[in-house]
A protein has these predicted regions:
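N-terminal secretory signal peptides that target proteins for export/translocation
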Residues: 1-10
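Bacterial N-terminal signal peptides
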Residues: 12-26
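Sec/Tat signal peptide C-region and signal peptidase I cleavage site
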Residues: 26-32
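Terminal "cap-and-tail" regions of soluble proteins that handle hydrophobic small molecules
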Residues: 33-65, 71, 76, 169-171, ...
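Terminal, regulation- and interaction-focused segments at domain boundaries
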Residues: 72-99, 120, 240-244
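Coil-to-beta-strand transition motifs
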Residues: 80, 159-161, 175-177, 187-193
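Amphipathic alpha-helical segments
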Residues: 89-115
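Glycine-rich portal/gate segments that line the openings of hydrophobic small-molecule binding cavities
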Residues: 115-179, 201, 259, 282, ...
Length: 308
């Protein structure tokens, strides 16, 4: 994998690749990592905090444009962006937490994304990492992609609460503090309440790259949050950096669902089930998530799977 400094050609190519993929981060001075709700200024412990979120979001979970129990929010300032999903999945908490407490599961999940070219689990001195390559939304050699290494940690895994954190200090073009966090609790109805948070920070180079991206190939791309109506009465959606965060947060959430949905099948057919289900799920939201045709996506992922 090539390293900095980047040529102008690589930077130009990167604008349409990595900015469509950016992962997760939280700088210390801007958007803080989501914390548990508070009562009287006292922080509620994680299980109670997530249960409080579930209660507070009941109306939004029951009535939303997704027509399913799912809430998507995004936040942005001059240095950071974060996307968050709260959702109810039918899987029992025990099944959910056991499946996602394995690092290989996360490589299987992340590999569903268009821009993931490679993911392998690495263990050294007791620490687990996910060694990834990201690149174009079409097939490409690994030597032309970008290497990212994420630490993977099961922070908490009990019968009442699960918290998994993926993080990386730095990425290309001054992107930094990548972070993706998954929290989950069991529900009395038998399902699982899930919170997925995805964030990253960027410096001047990254900011300029994003400005270029959003003025060219990313100009027409939008997220899911409705911000109003245009002069013709059509719905308008958030765009720019928040739209980017919302699209990728949804892609990763749908990848988790696709992974879980294949677990009951024999191992030899799970990969095909995952890639077909993930593509079908993204096509439910073509305005936001359609990028390539199904045959091209499936062919690319099958070929990429051979080199994992």
């Amino acid at each position: 994998v090539k390293n900095l400094p980047y040529s102008s050609t690589r930077v130009a190519a990167f604008l349409t690749v990595f900015l469509a993929y950016l992962f997760a981060a939280v700088p210390g001075v801007a958007l803080a990592e989501p914390t548990a709700p508070t009562a009287g200024g006292i922080e509620i412990e994680p299980v109670a905090g997530l249960r409080a979120q579930h209660v507070a979001m009941r109306e939004r979970l029951a009535n939303n444009d997704f027509k399913r129990p799912l809430v998507l929010d995004s936040f942005h300032n001059s240095q950071d962006v974060r996307g968050e999903i709260y959702a109810v999945v039918p899987d029992a908490f025990g099944v959910f937490s056991e499946a996602l407490a394995k690092p290989q599961a996360w490589c299987d999940i992340l590999n569903l994304h268009l821009n993931t070219k490679y993911c392998r689990v690495a263990v050294a001195k007791g620490a687990t990492s996910l060694v990834m390559n990201v690149g174009n939304k079409v097939e490409q050699p690994l030597k032309d992609s970008f290497r990212l290494v994420f630490s993977w940690n099961v922070a908490t895994n009990t019968a009442e609460y699960q918290r998994i954190i993926l993080s990386a200090d730095a990425g290309p073009l001054s992107t930094h503090n990548y972070r993706i966090t998954l929290e989950a609790i069991p529900l009395t109805t038998g399902g699982t309440f899930v919170h997925l948070s995805y964030s990253y920070g960027y410096g001047i180079t990254g900011r300029l790259a994003m400005l270029a991206y959003f003025s060219t190939s990313g100009r027409a791309k939008v997220g899911f949050t409705v911000i109003g109506k245009n002069a013709q009465g059509a719905t308008t959606y958030v765009d720019g950096i928040r739209g980017l965060a919302e699209r990728n947060t949804m892609r990763y959430y749908l990848a988790i669902e696709a992974y879980l949905g294949a677990l009951t099948l024999p191992p030899r057919v799970q990969f095909e089930k995952r890639i077909n289900d993930w593509f079908a799920a993204t096509e439910r939201y073509p305005r936001q998530l359609h990028e390539v045709e199904q045959r091209d996506y499936l062919s690319m992922k099958r070929n990429e799977n051979k080199r994992q």
